[in-house]
């Protein structure tokens, strides 16, 4: 793995789920929604610099270590590490049924 900042690319469905979560939280509190959104964005930016900082994704079948995941504010973010980018594959609430992939 090269020691440089990788670009972040969101899968369309993952990004839509992130936006939906923001809108859902915003119904109750704009301030809370902004805080959660900001902290998630910061966490995602950090993996561009330190992609191996989170454990391998336990829901990825035959994971070679390139698929990783972490939880923040009750949301689970799964991503794939490639040579040039981090692909955000999934964004879901932790109470939703996990899917193997």
Stretch-by-stretch model annotation:
Residues 50, 54-84:
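Basic/aromatic recognition patch in beta-strand/loop cores that engages polyanionic ligands
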Residues 22, 51, 92:
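Short, flexible helix/strand-to-coil boundary loops that buttress conserved ligand/catalytic motifs
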Residues 1, 72-76, 80-101:
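Enriched for short, Lys/Arg-rich terminal
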Residues 28, 34-38, 55-63, 99-100:
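Solvent-exposed interaction patches of small proteins and small membrane subunits
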Residues 22, 41-48:
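Structural signal for well-ordered, non-membrane alpha-helices
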Residues 39-42, 68:
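Hydrophobic alpha-helical segments of small multi-pass membrane proteins
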Residues 30, 45, 49-53, 75, ...:
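Generic structural signal for secondary-structure transition and capping sites
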Residues 1-39:
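Arg/Lys-rich, positively charged N-terminal/basic patches that mediate binding to nucleic acids
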